[in-house]
């Protein structure tokens, strides 16, 4: 049978049949695919495939358009400083946190994440923390290193974030959202120049607020004082957003029940201050230093293990401030209308600004209280009051305190002041009275605590002590249990062990200049009390803490004015008989004589005695307004002299009006002092050393002789040096600079590797490089200048700081 459309092949038969197998298109054998030899088969285009491709292209274009629009909107509203820089920073912080989380998941090492978080902090936080981390890592103890990161560094970073949140409020962030004020958010990271520029912008913003307020309120030419006060209120509200109290705020603010009329004359000077860039610079710089110090407390950089009482940065700033003040005093003098001049440095050193004079006056006052207590038969009790644990940032071992609530040093001081005020009110209600002195000093982490030396009747001692203990431990009472010693201590002073003055002498000295405490070691910090006096002074200046306060006695300012009056009278009277009366009234003259003799006990009794209200004191300080207005247009108050309610008129003790002027400088001497840096003149501008060498050659040629000071004894050398002129002293100082001091190369202290690492770490923590050159210099008996005339030296495996370092050699 013939088949025309099919191809026949020989195929095996089935069931004995001879029929041939027919091959159809659907079962034709396929050819093997070789992608290297055969060309790629292209699918045939169809209407459906073309439609799908068009839809895909439209979707891609729409997605690109939406992304572009989203980026434009995001950049317009969030990445534009003129819109909302705060939101931009929040978004950046969120992205950074996401990146950190991703890295943490990838690395799976929490220690590296902690180190990365530390590195992301500002330099004043990250640098000292990284130095500590590096030191712990160099010890080679992996478990202790990891435990230090997790138990110390991580809580420190968490506390740092809480402190920052408490510092920057919502209103403060709102102020930072204005044009040019973004720097307020990073105020603790700024230096002094940056704060000056920021203060200029803040003053400009206040000026614009005042212009806007005047435009809204002053609708007519006849402006009323109340409308001016409302304009002041708007500017003051802007200042309050920055957590700065406006000047004269209490007198000018709105009150429901005002007893006195509104002092509208205080509005112009208040506005002048709020519109002044210099005034804002002082306020912002003070805020910057306080915020920065609280951040350093949060990361445990202020404690006895690192820097007691206050950070090293604050100590260095205080030294620099003192150095600038000394330079200012030395370059100025005081002159009066008659042409008489006084050296300003001598005047400052002779005043109560001198720490030695301030210490002597307080010790004399305490001695006077002691004599009065003996005369009255009163007993003396020594109290110590401490803040609750929520005010303490660091434990005694240097680790973070888990109970700390981000309370500042200033808040701890305010807590003690409020507690003392409440106790005094309750004591007066019960008819109990006392008098004495209190000393405010810091713990190792900067928290304030008080020491009180109080005199009272013996029958009232138990009642006063119980009442004071009640108020001292009433907050957070549950954390004390049965032991109230950590919060309150009282000790009845036993005359057999020591006098009340001897009890308080150490606390007065170590909070002023450390005089007489060179060998005393602090039980809290383990350091000499004399070395810690500088830290305490910087702490009190930074946090504005009043260190000393006398209560229950007449004021000491009247005592100073009486002594000044006695000195003036002695100069006027000349050779008048000693003991002659100065004042006509015998009662007032007795007070003046007691003050002139320096006997506080007699002075207090002649004034009326202890526990006497101020209105009954015989002599009080008189004040008056300044003749010349200040830079802000107001007349400040200054001391006039003394006055008494039993006598008419006032006695002036400041009759002379003194002006401070810059000292006149001799141009030739100034040029000679500057040497090669002197400006071009017609004289010789060679360096000073060359001039001196030439002068010595001329003297030798003329046959002149040079005095040999090496053969003089101490008295002859003293007389010779004090008889030299200023020019001869400068020449001698220049010759001494040319002579290189001899070094003892054979002397070197031997220390272990661990002590070497500790020395390097402590040098770096104080702001030095900690290089081998510095370490070798210290080990060979040398010293490194640290500012304000002090030097650092290494003795007995301890780094010390003193201006008498050669005495330790």
Curated annotation (Swiss-Prot):
GO terms for molecular function: endonuclease activity. It holds the Pfam family Phage_GPA. Keywords: DNA replication, Endonuclease, Hydrolase, Nuclease. The keyword Hydrolase applies. Its EC number is 3.1.-.-. GO terms for biological process: DNA replication. The active site is at residues 503, 507. The keyword Repressor does not apply. Possible endonuclease which induces a single-strand cut and initiates DNA replication. Belongs to the phage GPA family. This is Probable replication endonuclease from prophage-like region.
